């Protein structure tokens, strides 16, 4: 909460935000994961953050996880987690397979509550449908990227991850107001676009996503 600023070094990208986790917090998180490993058959670690990697990205719509979050995900797997799920951002992020374990840095929102009563209280009931959609998307830009998500299904054989199947969903961006926030399988063209975007976002970790129809498949060797 007390940021410091300095001139970027040669290897750094201007505008990059660097965070430092509290050592005690990190220690407790990893300790709890190790305890869960001893008590459970399958451990999923999750962390809710909004931080972005760059000042150029809005926090809730940051498509690239900051460095400390990637480090946390790796340490969570090393401590015994079978999977790591990032929450907090309202858009999609990339996917990494780390030591044979899936890391989902951001799958988007599975559903969203439409708080129309708040608009009525604030005197915004006369907004046009397009204006309500922009407000509902909460993306400060009017597009519907934050209304697109993924359902990920991981397949295992003999305890080892063999593949992850990705099913694109959307929250009623092109339907009536009554469907806003309700998840449904994305149409083929939308599914293709969503999967291609996630594929690009996953490039930095070398994750290959095969797109077969409206499904993305990550095959783990």
Predicted ranges, named:
Residues 1-221:
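Acidic, metal/ion-coordinating pockets
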């Amino acid at each position: 909460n007390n940021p410091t600023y300095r001139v970027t070094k040669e290897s750094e990208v201007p505008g990059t935000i660097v965070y430092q986790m509290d050592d005690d917090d990190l220690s407790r998180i990893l300790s709890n994961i190790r305890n869960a490993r001893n008590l459970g058959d399958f451990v999923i670690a999750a962390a809710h953050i909004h931080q972005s990697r760059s000042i150029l990205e809005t926090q809730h719509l940051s498509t690239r996880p900051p460095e400390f979050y990637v480090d946390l995900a790796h340490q969570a797997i090393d401590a015994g987690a079978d999977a790591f799920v990032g929450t907090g951002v309202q858009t999609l992020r990339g996917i990494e397979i780390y030591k044979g374990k899936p890391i989902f840095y951001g799958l988007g929102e599975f559903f969203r509550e439409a708080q129309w009563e708040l608009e009525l209280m604030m005197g915004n009931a006369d907004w046009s449908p397009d204006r309500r959609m922009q407000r509902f998307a909460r993306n400060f830009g009017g597009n519907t990227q934050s209304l697109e998500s993924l359902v990920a299904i991981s397949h295992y054989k003999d305890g080892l991850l063999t593949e992850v199947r990705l099913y694109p969903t959307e929250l009623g961006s092109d339907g009536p107001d009554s469907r806003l926030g309700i998840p449904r399988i994305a149409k083929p063209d939308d599914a293709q676009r969503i999967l291609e975007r996630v594929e690009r976002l996953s490039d930095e970790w070398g994750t290959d996503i095969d797109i077969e129809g409206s499904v993305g498949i990550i095959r783990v060797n």
